């Protein structure tokens, strides 16, 4: 047993309990973004494409509608870092001109075969790089820096006809479970403005769930697509590593494990849109996923776990989330899936395995470097004192990330090696079991926590583990609309490498049961 982990876990549990009344007071008002009035903003990506192609809806009209909604909700959620509204409108008008000509020439279908997202607006996580827009990734030392090129996934979406509207907020260098930084401030959950939108793709999730974007290009290194999607009632897919290009992503690490842990993926409001978005974002690699191959749910084996750990270093999963995982598993059984009661006991040390493998990367960014002089490292305690007094160059969670990275949960070298060995065994076991199946697991220990409730940050281990296992996974909402005063609850659907289509097929089926995305109010 890792005794220091146990002690730290006990302290966090006690502290979380002591602070619970304070956070309850902060979230009791349950303020939300303004209601979504424009019915066009509820359309799926597929429906937008269909209506643009038929001429029922113009690219300019839908782009204008999304811009108006962004301007309406951003003062509440603080998700936008920099926009390109004028350029987007110009591009939309040009698309409409080209489509009118294609209709006259009888080539409208050809236009959409070449560009399957032609005229559809979308948004981009700042770290994924959009030409000419901010690329500071929440860091004071990079304030004013602009992206010189599009990131690989963004370039693929633009080549498919997508029209980018803006870049959205992230924590410093994407190293956080909450989207906050000293440069751009804190992004808020549209379902309850006193709660977290998750991280590190919280800006994307907050916009999309507000009805301010049909889909977004985001990234996931420890749950950064799935956790915000879960907190905001959306579908977020972390693909098999290497499928979608990560070129241009900030930060970039040289360690070989980085390209296995980091993936770029879509966040969307409708599960049915995920295959189309994956196909576009992946480019030529999409064929490896066989997304067009039908999935017979009767041949899919379903495993499920309501709690993946007995580690005292983690706070227990909420009862509501456990019940939803069981409900999802039973529904899939009723749909003809084979339901397995086998449990993967290796998950007992999910936190220790995740941390041991993740922090084994060699060049993780040092959040204590002085923004004014990167050769100087600031003292952790002095910087913490500055932050406590309302100053400092980093957010609280950036400093907590530094503590976690340097301490590695105070695990000994021998313990870390043991946990990495257990992780390898679990990976081999899951790759075999999930070759024709999926594993249902909570996406987090709770629904969206109050802003700043860092005592619950360890819950990110549920998503981080999937990254270090190098597996694909989809976050899916499991109660829609969430019963007031709750924020959305979600689970994640995990499968073996290159079996992404199984995750998505199950997510689409569960959308029928739980209702999928439901906007605030």
Feature annotation, model-predicted:
Residues 1-93, 97-100, 317, 327, ...:
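An N-terminal boundary/leader segment
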Residues 1-5, 72, 209-308, 326-338, ...:
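Structural helix-boundary/capping segments
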Residues 2-23, 269-289, 313-348, 365-379:
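Acidic-enriched catalytic cores of C-N bond-cleaving enzymes acting on peptides and small amides
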Residues 24, 28-32, 36, 117-140, ...:
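Short helix-loop capping/hinge segments that flank enzyme active sites or metal/cofactor-binding pockets
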Residues 46-53, 310-313, 366-469, 502, ...:
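Serine-dependent amide/ester hydrolase catalytic core
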Residues 48-54, 123, 141-145, 262-269, ...:
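Short, well-ordered beta-strand elements within core beta-sheets of diverse protein domains
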Residues 95, 99-120, 291-303:
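Immediate post-signal peptide segment of exported/extracytoplasmic ligand-binding proteins
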Residues 115-262, 305-307, 442-455:
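Short glycine/serine-rich loop/turn segments
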């Amino acid at each position: 047993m890792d005794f220091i982990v146990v002690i730290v876990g006990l302290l966090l549990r006690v502290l979380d309990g002591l602070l619970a009344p304070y956070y309850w007071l902060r979230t009791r008002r349950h303020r939300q973004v303004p209601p979504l009035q424009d019915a066009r903003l509820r359309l799926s990506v597929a429906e937008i494409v269909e209506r643009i192609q038929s001429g029922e809806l113009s690219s300019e009209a839908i782009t204008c509608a999304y811009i108006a909604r962004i301007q309406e909700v951003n003062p509440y959620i603080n998700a936008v870092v920099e926009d390109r509204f004028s350029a987007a409108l110009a591009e939309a008008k040009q698309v409409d001109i080209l489509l009118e000509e294609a209709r006259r020439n009888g080539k409208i279908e050809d236009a959409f075969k070449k560009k399957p997202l032609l005229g559809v607006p979308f948004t981009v996580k700042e770290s994924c790089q959009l030409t000419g827009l901010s690329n500071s990734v929440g860091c004071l030392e990079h304030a004013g820096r602009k992206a010189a090129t599009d990131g690989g996934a963004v370039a693929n979406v633009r080549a498919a006809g997508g029209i980018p509207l803006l870049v959205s907020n992230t924590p410093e260098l994407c190293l956080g479970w909450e989207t906050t930084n000293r440069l751009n401030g804190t992004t808020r959950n549209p379902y309850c403005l006193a709660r977290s939108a998750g991280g590190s793709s919280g800006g994307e999730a907050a916009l999309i769930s507000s009805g301010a974007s049909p889909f977004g290009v985001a990234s996931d290194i420890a749950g950064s697509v799935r956790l915000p999607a879960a907190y905001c009632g959306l579908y977020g897919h972390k693909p098999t590593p290497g499928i979608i290009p990560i070129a241009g992503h900030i930060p970039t690490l040289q360690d070989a494990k980085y390209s296995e842990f980091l993936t770029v993926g879509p966040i969307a409001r409708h599960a049915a849109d995920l295959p189309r978005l994956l196909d576009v974002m992946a480019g030529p690699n999409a064929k490896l996923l066989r997304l067009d191959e039908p999935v017979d749910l009767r041949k899919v084996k379903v495993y499920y776990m309501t709690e993946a750990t007995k580690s005292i270093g983690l706070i227990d999963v909420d009862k509501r989330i456990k019940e939803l995982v069981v409900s999802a598993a039973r529904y899939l059984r009723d749909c003809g899936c084979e339901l397995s009661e086998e449990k993967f006991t290796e998950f007992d040390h999910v936190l220790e395995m995740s941390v041991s493998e993740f922090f084994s990367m060699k060049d993780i960014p040092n959040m204590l470097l002085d923004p004014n002089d990167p050769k100087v490292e600031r003292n952790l305690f002095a910087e913490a004192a500055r932050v406590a007094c309302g100053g400092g160059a980093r957010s609280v969670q950036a400093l907590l990330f530094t503590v976690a990275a340097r301490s590695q949960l105070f695990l000994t070298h021998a313990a870390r090696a043991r946990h990495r060995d257990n992780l390898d065994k679990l990976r081999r076991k899951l790759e075999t079991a999930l070759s024709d199946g999926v594993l249902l697991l909570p996406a987090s220990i709770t629904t969206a926590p109050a802003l700043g409730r860092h005592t619950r940050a360890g819950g990110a281990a549920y998503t981080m583990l999937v990254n270090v296992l190098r597996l694909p996974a989809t976050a899916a909402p499991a109660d829609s609309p969430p019963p007031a005063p709750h924020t959305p609850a979600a689970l994640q659907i995990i499968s073996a490498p290159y079996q992404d289509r199984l995750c998505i097929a199950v997510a689409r089926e569960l959308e029928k049961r739980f209702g999928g995305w439901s906007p605030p109010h």
